[in-house]
Each structure stands twice: as structure tokens, then as C-alpha cells.
Amino acid sequence: MTESESAAVPVDAAAFREAMSRLASAVHLITTDGPGGRAGFTASAVCSVSDAPPTLLVCINRASSAYAALTQNGTLCVNTLGEGHETVASLFGGRTPVDERFAAGTWRRLRSGAPALADALVSFDCRIVGRHAVGSHDVLYCAVEAVAASGQADALLYSERRYRTLPRAPRSGSAPAEPARAARAVGARPAEGPALALRSA
């Protein structure tokens, strides 16, 4: 077998998931509300596409319980979580009924009407402007129409199948801070989490 032929052999899905579990990712709640109903899920597959115009990329499994509402509403809010949000992240990442998911937080509405978590580190209110199917998922291109930053907690990360926190950096000009701390694990490994955002509840 030549080197090029060897490279063409598909990577085992389990091996890929294990490799991806070693990447530390921010944790987000993706929420929506509108004609298709209220829904939400926990995701780590979120990133910036452009700042001209401001655009985010969000991935969702087409088997997700939130998929129908999200696509029908055409809007969503990306709520980036911080320390103390482990419970709500786990609720939105499992099979918890929708009403119980939203009962775990305090919500407000931004421009689109999608629920924005009041104490999220930051909430990006978006309109879905493009969609591309890749395997089991849709890649959504989301135009950011409003931003609300209110949370002051350390960032919440998901790595090695558990939640961890990353301390905030000191502001420029502030008093000398303690030596930088490594990201620390938070609580027990959750039964469900954002995983790779390859699977969304």
C-alpha cells in the first residue's frame, strides 16, 4: 500500500471522538424561540467566521430535538457559559424536557426573540443566513445582530469529557495578579455534555 492509499483510509469514528475529547472548547447554550417553538442544546462546535459582517458558525446534529425548531425559527442565540453554569450545561446537553431546561436559568430577549441567558459571559443574538450539510450535521452560518456581555465568571471549558474552568486574565493596568493558574476541573464528569457537539440533544 502506498502512502497516499494509506492516507485515504477513513479514520475510525471512535478514535476520532477520543482524539477530539482532548481539545479544550468553550461551552455554549444554543437557544431559539419563535413559530417553531422554544428549544436549546449545549454545544462546543461554535466559532467566529468573520467580523465584516460579524458572523458565527454553529454546528447541529440533524437528529437533535432542537433541529426542527431552530431551522423553522431561523434565529438563535449563542450563550457562552462561565463557572457556575455546569448544571444548566448538563441539562441542555441531555434528554431533559424543554421546560425543565429553561427553568434552570434566568432569561431575557434580545433582537431576535431567542432566549438569552441573563448571566452568560456573552450572548450573541443571530439570524441564520446559510446552511451546509456535512455528514450527520448542518453547519449554520449566523449573522450576529446583537451582543450582550454581562457575566464576570471564569470561562467554562469542556475537555476530556468533563467541565473545567479557565481563570479570567487580569485587566491591563490592574494590580499585579497571582501567578497564572492552570485550568481546573469542576465537579464530577457529567453524564451528558457537549461532547464534540457532534451529538446534540
Swiss-Prot record:
Function: Catalyzes the reduction of FMN to FMNH2 which is used to reduce pyrimidine by RutA via the Rut pathway.
Any one Pfam family match given in the protein's UniProt record, by short name: Flavin_Reduct
Top-level taxon in the UniProt lineage: Bacteria
Catalytic activity entry: FMNH2 + NAD(+) = FMN + NADH + 2 H(+)
Protein family according to the UniProt entry: Belongs to the non-flavoprotein flavin reductase family. RutF subfamily.
Keyword RNA-binding: no
EC number(s) stated in the UniProt entry for this protein: 1.5.1.42
Biased composition (Low complexity): 167-195
Gene name in the database record: rutF1
HAMAP family given in the database record: RutF (MF_00833)
SMART domains: Flavin_Reduct
The protein's name: FMN reductase (NADH) RutF 1
Species lineage: Bacteria, Pseudomonadati, Pseudomonadota, Alphaproteobacteria, Hyphomicrobiales
Molecular functions (GO terms): FMN binding; FMN reductase (NADH) activity; FMN reductase [NAD(P)H] activity; riboflavin reductase (NADPH) activity
Region (Disordered): 167-201
Keyword entries, A-Z: Flavoprotein, FMN, NAD, Oxidoreductase
GO biological process: nitrogen utilization; uracil catabolic process
